[in-house]
Amino acid sequence: MRGKDAHQGDIFMISLDPTVGSEIRGTRPVLVLSNKDFNQGGRALVAPITQGGNFERVAGWAVTLMGSGTATQGAVVVSQCRVLDLAARAAKKLEAVPDDLLDDCLAKLEAITAH
């Protein structure tokens, strides 16, 4: 899988390791938040999807997949997004999320980065 083939709203299975501290770790699904122009560089801005993330859920930095119609379950933890080389990490595409769910995630990212 080439990183430039990733589309905003795609879900991939990928290893997030190595990590440090309280970063979400392990092999898990991630949601691509970056647009196709950014992804052309071979990397993508992604947010991990987890069954945990209780702090982020309470704080409002996570978006649940419940009721979205996706096979992937859990919550997109926007507060832990990072840029990854999808090809180097052998990412496997699983599915894509509906536009309204992607919009919710992008709104959370905007809230995090607003000044």
Predicted segments, located by residue:
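Conserved functional hotspots at enzyme active or ligand-binding sites that engage polyanionic ligands
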Residues: 1-115
